[in-house]
Amino acid sequence: MAPALPITLPSKMSLRSLKWSLLLLSLLSFLVMWYLSLPHYNVIERVNWMYFYEYEPIYRQDFHFTLREHSNCSHQNPFLVILVTSHPADVKARQAIRVTWGEKKSWWGYEVLTFFLLGQQAEREDKVLALSLEDEHLLYGDIIRQDFLDTYNNLTLKTIMAFRWVTEFCPNARYIMKTDTDVFINTGNLVKYLLNLNHSEKFFTGYPLIDNYSYRGFYQKTHISYQEYPFKVFPPYCSGLGYIMSRDLVPRIYEMMSHVKPIKFEDVYVGICLNLLKVDIHIPEDTNLFFLYRIHLDVCQLRRVIAAHGFSSKEIITFWQVMLRNTTCHY
Protein backbone atom coordinates (compact mmCIF):
# COMPACT_ATOMS: atom_id res chain seq x y z
CA MET A 1 0.00 0.00 0.00
CA ALA A 2 1.37 3.35 -1.05
CA PRO A 3 2.14 5.78 1.69
CA ALA A 4 -0.39 8.62 2.06
CA LEU A 5 0.74 11.96 0.72
CA PRO A 6 0.96 14.68 3.29
CA ILE A 7 -1.86 17.27 3.07
CA THR A 8 -0.67 20.84 3.39
CA LEU A 9 -3.28 23.12 4.89
CA PRO A 10 -3.28 26.74 3.76
CA SER A 11 -1.80 29.13 6.19
CA LYS A 12 -3.74 31.98 7.74
CA MET A 13 -1.81 34.36 5.50
CA SER A 14 -2.89 32.51 2.34
CA LEU A 15 -6.53 32.47 3.42
CA ARG A 16 -6.40 36.18 4.13
CA SER A 17 -4.90 36.86 0.68
CA LEU A 18 -7.56 34.70 -0.98
CA LYS A 19 -10.28 36.49 0.92
CA TRP A 20 -9.00 39.92 -0.18
CA SER A 21 -8.60 38.72 -3.76
CA LEU A 22 -12.22 37.55 -3.90
CA LEU A 23 -13.37 40.81 -2.32
CA LEU A 24 -11.43 42.89 -4.84
CA LEU A 25 -12.75 40.75 -7.69
CA SER A 26 -16.32 41.28 -6.49
CA LEU A 27 -15.72 45.02 -6.18
CA LEU A 28 -14.20 45.13 -9.67
CA SER A 29 -17.19 43.24 -11.09
CA PHE A 30 -19.55 45.67 -9.41
CA LEU A 31 -17.65 48.68 -10.81
CA VAL A 32 -17.67 47.21 -14.32
CA MET A 33 -21.42 46.59 -14.16
CA TRP A 34 -21.99 50.11 -12.80
CA TYR A 35 -19.83 51.64 -15.54
CA LEU A 36 -21.65 49.71 -18.25
CA SER A 37 -24.96 50.96 -16.88
CA LEU A 38 -23.95 54.60 -17.25
CA PRO A 39 -25.90 56.67 -19.84
CA HIS A 40 -23.06 56.83 -22.37
CA TYR A 41 -23.46 53.09 -22.94
CA ASN A 42 -27.20 53.56 -23.31
CA VAL A 43 -26.85 56.17 -26.04
CA ILE A 44 -28.89 55.10 -29.03
CA GLU A 45 -26.46 54.54 -31.90
CA ARG A 46 -28.94 54.43 -34.76
CA VAL A 47 -30.72 57.76 -35.09
CA ASN A 48 -34.48 57.46 -35.40
CA TRP A 49 -35.96 60.95 -35.78
CA MET A 50 -39.46 59.65 -35.04
CA TYR A 51 -38.23 59.40 -31.44
CA PHE A 52 -38.91 63.15 -31.20
CA TYR A 53 -42.28 63.11 -32.95
CA GLU A 54 -45.68 63.19 -31.24
CA TYR A 55 -48.76 62.53 -33.37
CA GLU A 56 -50.77 65.13 -31.49
CA PRO A 57 -49.58 68.78 -31.51
CA ILE A 58 -48.91 68.76 -27.78
CA TYR A 59 -45.93 71.12 -28.01
CA ARG A 60 -47.72 74.07 -29.60
CA GLN A 61 -46.52 77.21 -27.82
CA ASP A 62 -49.17 79.67 -26.65
CA PHE A 63 -47.04 82.62 -25.59
CA HIS A 64 -48.57 86.02 -26.31
CA PHE A 65 -47.10 88.73 -28.50
CA THR A 66 -46.45 91.78 -26.32
CA LEU A 67 -44.85 93.80 -29.14
CA ARG A 68 -45.26 93.47 -32.88
CA GLU A 69 -43.98 95.31 -35.95
CA HIS A 70 -45.71 98.51 -37.05
CA SER A 71 -45.84 97.64 -40.73
CA ASN A 72 -48.63 95.30 -41.78
CA CYS A 73 -46.42 92.66 -43.35
CA SER A 74 -49.39 90.48 -44.24
CA HIS A 75 -50.32 93.04 -46.91
CA GLN A 76 -46.78 93.31 -48.26
CA ASN A 77 -44.74 91.06 -50.53
CA PRO A 78 -41.15 91.51 -49.34
CA PHE A 79 -38.45 89.65 -51.20
CA LEU A 80 -36.55 88.94 -47.97
CA VAL A 81 -37.31 89.21 -44.27
CA ILE A 82 -34.35 89.05 -41.86
CA LEU A 83 -35.19 88.10 -38.27
CA VAL A 84 -32.49 88.87 -35.70
CA THR A 85 -32.46 87.29 -32.24
CA SER A 86 -31.66 89.93 -29.65
CA HIS A 87 -31.64 90.38 -25.88
CA PRO A 88 -33.79 93.21 -24.47
CA ALA A 89 -30.70 94.99 -23.10
CA ASP A 90 -28.83 94.87 -26.45
CA VAL A 91 -29.94 98.34 -27.56
CA LYS A 92 -26.51 99.19 -29.03
CA ALA A 93 -26.44 95.95 -31.03
CA ARG A 94 -29.85 96.64 -32.54
CA GLN A 95 -28.93 100.22 -33.32
CA ALA A 96 -25.68 99.12 -35.01
CA ILE A 97 -27.68 96.88 -37.34
CA ARG A 98 -30.25 99.62 -38.03
CA VAL A 99 -27.54 101.98 -39.32
CA THR A 100 -25.56 99.34 -41.26
CA TRP A 101 -26.70 96.17 -43.00
CA GLY A 102 -30.32 96.50 -41.83
CA GLU A 103 -30.79 100.12 -42.89
CA LYS A 104 -31.48 99.80 -46.59
CA LYS A 105 -35.02 98.63 -47.32
CA SER A 106 -34.65 98.00 -51.04
CA TRP A 107 -31.89 96.37 -53.10
CA TRP A 108 -32.30 96.74 -56.87
CA GLY A 109 -36.03 97.12 -56.34
CA TYR A 110 -36.36 94.07 -54.06
CA GLU A 111 -37.78 94.85 -50.63
CA VAL A 112 -35.79 93.68 -47.59
CA LEU A 113 -37.25 94.03 -44.07
CA THR A 114 -35.36 93.51 -40.80
CA PHE A 115 -36.97 92.76 -37.43
CA PHE A 116 -35.66 91.88 -33.96
CA LEU A 117 -36.84 88.91 -31.88
CA LEU A 118 -37.04 89.36 -28.11
CA GLY A 119 -38.42 87.70 -25.00
CA GLN A 120 -39.11 89.26 -21.62
CA GLN A 121 -36.13 90.62 -19.67
CA ALA A 122 -37.08 88.86 -16.43
CA GLU A 123 -40.07 87.34 -14.69
CA ARG A 124 -40.52 90.71 -13.00
CA GLU A 125 -39.31 92.83 -15.85
CA ASP A 126 -37.49 96.02 -14.97
CA LYS A 127 -39.98 98.84 -15.57
CA VAL A 128 -37.36 101.26 -16.84
CA LEU A 129 -36.17 98.76 -19.44
CA ALA A 130 -39.74 97.91 -20.40
CA LEU A 131 -40.50 101.56 -21.02
CA SER A 132 -37.32 102.05 -23.01
CA LEU A 133 -38.20 99.04 -25.16
CA GLU A 134 -41.67 100.47 -25.70
CA ASP A 135 -40.11 103.79 -26.74
CA GLU A 136 -37.64 102.00 -29.00
CA HIS A 137 -40.48 100.12 -30.62
CA LEU A 138 -42.53 103.30 -31.07
CA LEU A 139 -39.55 104.90 -32.78
CA TYR A 140 -38.54 102.05 -35.10
CA GLY A 141 -41.46 99.62 -35.14
CA ASP A 142 -39.17 96.65 -35.72
CA ILE A 143 -39.42 94.65 -32.47
CA ILE A 144 -41.26 91.34 -32.16
CA ARG A 145 -41.63 90.10 -28.58
CA GLN A 146 -43.47 87.39 -26.67
CA ASP A 147 -43.93 86.91 -22.93
CA PHE A 148 -41.46 84.04 -22.34
CA LEU A 149 -38.29 84.62 -20.32
CA ASP A 150 -35.40 85.81 -22.50
CA THR A 151 -32.57 83.38 -21.65
CA TYR A 152 -29.99 81.39 -23.60
CA ASN A 153 -31.86 78.15 -22.93
CA ASN A 154 -35.04 79.72 -24.35
CA LEU A 155 -33.54 80.56 -27.74
CA THR A 156 -35.61 77.74 -29.20
CA LEU A 157 -38.80 79.46 -28.01
CA LYS A 158 -37.59 82.61 -29.76
CA THR A 159 -37.10 80.66 -32.98
CA ILE A 160 -40.57 79.11 -32.69
CA MET A 161 -41.90 82.66 -32.25
CA ALA A 162 -40.13 83.67 -35.47
CA PHE A 163 -41.74 80.84 -37.46
CA ARG A 164 -45.13 81.61 -35.96
CA TRP A 165 -44.85 85.33 -36.75
CA VAL A 166 -43.93 84.71 -40.39
CA THR A 167 -46.70 82.12 -40.76
CA GLU A 168 -49.39 84.33 -39.26
CA PHE A 169 -48.29 87.89 -40.02
CA CYS A 170 -45.84 87.83 -42.94
CA PRO A 171 -46.75 84.85 -45.14
CA ASN A 172 -45.90 86.54 -48.45
CA ALA A 173 -42.18 87.01 -47.80
CA ARG A 174 -40.33 85.12 -50.52
CA TYR A 175 -37.30 84.25 -48.38
CA ILE A 176 -36.68 84.35 -44.63
CA MET A 177 -33.37 84.51 -42.80
CA LYS A 178 -32.81 83.98 -39.07
CA THR A 179 -29.60 85.44 -37.64
CA ASP A 180 -28.05 87.01 -34.50
CA THR A 181 -26.91 90.48 -33.45
CA ASP A 182 -23.22 89.52 -33.51
CA VAL A 183 -23.33 88.55 -37.19
CA PHE A 184 -22.16 90.76 -40.05
CA ILE A 185 -24.56 90.40 -42.98
CA ASN A 186 -23.58 91.50 -46.47
CA THR A 187 -27.16 92.24 -47.47
CA GLY A 188 -26.34 93.01 -51.09
CA ASN A 189 -24.54 89.69 -51.55
CA LEU A 190 -27.40 87.88 -49.84
CA VAL A 191 -29.98 89.36 -52.22
CA LYS A 192 -27.78 88.57 -55.25
CA TYR A 193 -27.34 84.99 -54.05
CA LEU A 194 -31.10 84.49 -53.69
CA LEU A 195 -31.81 86.07 -57.08
CA ASN A 196 -29.45 83.60 -58.75
CA LEU A 197 -31.08 80.48 -57.29
CA ASN A 198 -32.45 77.96 -59.74
CA HIS A 199 -35.33 77.07 -57.45
CA SER A 200 -37.36 78.94 -54.86
CA GLU A 201 -39.20 76.11 -53.08
CA LYS A 202 -38.16 73.58 -50.45
CA PHE A 203 -34.94 75.56 -50.06
CA PHE A 204 -32.92 75.72 -46.83
CA THR A 205 -29.29 76.80 -46.57
CA GLY A 206 -26.63 78.32 -44.33
CA TYR A 207 -23.44 77.09 -42.69
CA PRO A 208 -23.99 73.30 -42.79
CA LEU A 209 -23.01 71.10 -39.84
CA ILE A 210 -23.04 67.43 -40.78
CA ASP A 211 -22.35 64.57 -38.32
CA ASN A 212 -21.80 67.03 -35.50
CA TYR A 213 -21.46 65.22 -32.15
CA SER A 214 -23.48 66.05 -29.05
CA TYR A 215 -21.34 67.35 -26.18
CA ARG A 216 -21.59 65.75 -22.73
CA GLY A 217 -18.82 67.66 -20.95
CA PHE A 218 -18.88 70.30 -18.25
CA TYR A 219 -19.15 73.46 -20.39
CA GLN A 220 -22.82 74.23 -19.83
CA LYS A 221 -23.36 76.44 -22.88
CA THR A 222 -22.71 73.55 -25.28
CA HIS A 223 -23.68 70.65 -23.00
CA ILE A 224 -26.87 68.73 -23.68
CA SER A 225 -28.14 65.95 -21.43
CA TYR A 226 -28.89 62.37 -22.49
CA GLN A 227 -32.45 62.83 -21.30
CA GLU A 228 -32.95 65.78 -23.64
CA TYR A 229 -31.07 64.31 -26.60
CA PRO A 230 -30.17 60.58 -26.40
CA PHE A 231 -28.23 60.35 -29.67
CA LYS A 232 -24.50 60.74 -30.23
CA VAL A 233 -24.85 62.63 -33.51
CA PHE A 234 -26.98 65.66 -34.29
CA PRO A 235 -29.04 65.70 -37.48
CA PRO A 236 -27.70 67.67 -40.44
CA TYR A 237 -28.48 71.29 -39.61
CA CYS A 238 -27.35 74.85 -40.33
CA SER A 239 -25.65 76.94 -37.67
CA GLY A 240 -27.79 79.53 -35.94
CA LEU A 241 -25.41 82.25 -37.13
CA GLY A 242 -27.71 82.58 -40.12
CA TYR A 243 -29.93 80.17 -42.04
CA ILE A 244 -32.14 81.02 -45.00
CA MET A 245 -35.29 79.32 -46.26
CA SER A 246 -37.98 79.68 -48.88
CA ARG A 247 -41.44 80.75 -47.71
CA ASP A 248 -43.09 77.38 -48.40
CA LEU A 249 -41.00 75.77 -45.66
CA VAL A 250 -41.92 78.20 -42.89
CA PRO A 251 -45.51 77.03 -42.20
CA ARG A 252 -44.46 73.39 -42.63
CA ILE A 253 -41.64 73.72 -40.10
CA TYR A 254 -43.86 75.71 -37.73
CA GLU A 255 -46.53 73.00 -37.84
CA MET A 256 -43.89 70.32 -37.24
CA MET A 257 -42.64 72.27 -34.20
CA SER A 258 -45.97 71.65 -32.48
CA HIS A 259 -45.24 67.91 -32.69
CA VAL A 260 -41.59 68.05 -31.56
CA LYS A 261 -40.53 68.85 -28.00
CA PRO A 262 -38.18 71.87 -27.92
CA ILE A 263 -34.55 71.18 -27.06
CA LYS A 264 -31.83 73.52 -25.87
CA PHE A 265 -30.19 74.24 -29.25
CA GLU A 266 -32.53 76.03 -31.63
CA ASP A 267 -30.53 75.28 -34.77
CA VAL A 268 -30.42 71.55 -33.97
CA TYR A 269 -34.15 71.69 -33.21
CA VAL A 270 -34.86 73.14 -36.65
CA GLY A 271 -32.61 70.41 -38.09
CA ILE A 272 -34.74 67.72 -36.42
CA CYS A 273 -37.88 69.25 -37.94
CA LEU A 274 -36.24 69.35 -41.38
CA ASN A 275 -35.30 65.67 -41.10
CA LEU A 276 -38.84 64.73 -40.11
CA LEU A 277 -40.10 66.70 -43.12
CA LYS A 278 -37.49 64.98 -45.32
CA VAL A 279 -36.05 68.32 -46.44
CA ASP A 280 -32.39 68.29 -47.42
CA ILE A 281 -30.07 71.16 -46.59
CA HIS A 282 -28.70 72.95 -49.63
CA ILE A 283 -24.91 73.15 -49.27
CA PRO A 284 -23.53 76.25 -51.05
CA GLU A 285 -20.93 75.57 -53.72
CA ASP A 286 -18.92 78.53 -52.43
CA THR A 287 -17.69 77.53 -48.97
CA ASN A 288 -16.73 81.12 -48.14
CA LEU A 289 -20.25 82.54 -47.99
CA PHE A 290 -20.81 81.78 -44.29
CA PHE A 291 -18.18 82.05 -41.54
CA LEU A 292 -19.01 80.33 -38.26
CA TYR A 293 -15.94 81.31 -36.26
CA ARG A 294 -14.44 84.73 -35.55
CA ILE A 295 -11.73 85.28 -38.12
CA HIS A 296 -9.80 88.31 -39.31
CA LEU A 297 -11.57 89.28 -42.51
CA ASP A 298 -10.45 92.26 -44.53
CA VAL A 299 -12.89 94.47 -46.40
CA CYS A 300 -12.36 92.65 -49.70
CA GLN A 301 -13.26 89.31 -48.10
CA LEU A 302 -16.33 90.82 -46.42
CA ARG A 303 -17.53 91.97 -49.82
CA ARG A 304 -17.75 88.32 -50.86
CA VAL A 305 -19.45 86.79 -47.80
CA ILE A 306 -23.11 86.54 -46.90
CA ALA A 307 -22.71 86.18 -43.12
CA ALA A 308 -19.75 86.23 -40.73
CA HIS A 309 -20.14 85.48 -37.01
CA GLY A 310 -18.43 87.04 -34.00
CA PHE A 311 -18.55 90.80 -34.54
CA SER A 312 -19.13 93.45 -31.89
CA SER A 313 -21.51 96.33 -32.56
CA LYS A 314 -18.57 98.70 -33.03
CA GLU A 315 -16.91 96.32 -35.50
CA ILE A 316 -20.10 95.94 -37.52
CA ILE A 317 -20.31 99.73 -37.92
CA THR A 318 -16.60 100.09 -38.74
CA PHE A 319 -16.51 97.28 -41.31
CA TRP A 320 -19.73 98.46 -42.95
CA GLN A 321 -18.38 101.99 -43.38
CA VAL A 322 -15.11 100.68 -44.81
CA MET A 323 -16.93 98.28 -47.12
CA LEU A 324 -18.96 101.13 -48.62
CA ARG A 325 -15.81 102.93 -49.72
CA ASN A 326 -14.53 102.48 -53.24
CA THR A 327 -11.73 100.15 -52.23
CA THR A 328 -10.21 98.28 -55.17
CA CYS A 329 -9.93 94.53 -54.63
CA HIS A 330 -7.54 92.52 -56.79
CA TYR A 331 -8.51 89.06 -55.49
Swiss-Prot record:
For this UniProt record, give its keywords in alphabetical order, as a comma-separated list. Glycoprotein, Glycosyltransferase, Golgi apparatus, Lipid metabolism, Magnesium, Membrane, Signal-anchor, Transferase, Transmembrane, Transmembrane helix
Q: Which residues cross the membrane?
A: 21-43
- Which domain of life does this protein belong to? Eukaryota
Name the GO terms of the biological process aspect.
lipid metabolic process; oligosaccharide biosynthetic process; protein O-linked glycosylation
* One of the record's GO cellular component terms: Golgi membrane
Q: Which residues lie on this side of the membrane: Lumenal?
A: 44-331
Pathway membership, UniProt: Protein modification; protein glycosylation
Q: How does it sit in the membrane?
A: Single-pass type II membrane protein
Q: Which cofactor does it need?
A: Mg(2+)
Provide the primary localization: Golgi
* Reactions this protein catalyses: a globoside Gb3Cer (d18:1(4E)) + UDP-N-acetyl-alpha-D-galactosamine = a globoside Gb4Cer (d18:1(4E)) + UDP + H(+)
Q: Which residues lie on this side of the membrane: Cytoplasmic?
A: 1-20
What GO terms are given for molecular function?
Answer: galactosylgalactosylglucosylceramide beta-D-acetylgalactosaminyltransferase activity; N-acetyl-beta-D-glucosaminide beta-(1,3)-galactosyltransferase activity
Location of the protein in the cell: Golgi apparatus membrane
Kindly list every residue the record annotates as glycosylated.
72, 154, 198, 212, 326
| Gene3D superfamilies, alphabetized | 3.90.550.50
EC assignment: the record states: 2.4.1.79
| Functional note | Transfers N-acetylgalactosamine onto globotriaosylceramide. Plays a critical role in preimplantation stage embryonic development.
Family membership = Belongs to the glycosyltransferase 31 family.
Recorded protein name is UDP-GalNAc:beta-1,3-N-acetylgalactosaminyltransferase 1
Species annotation: Sus scrofa (Pig)
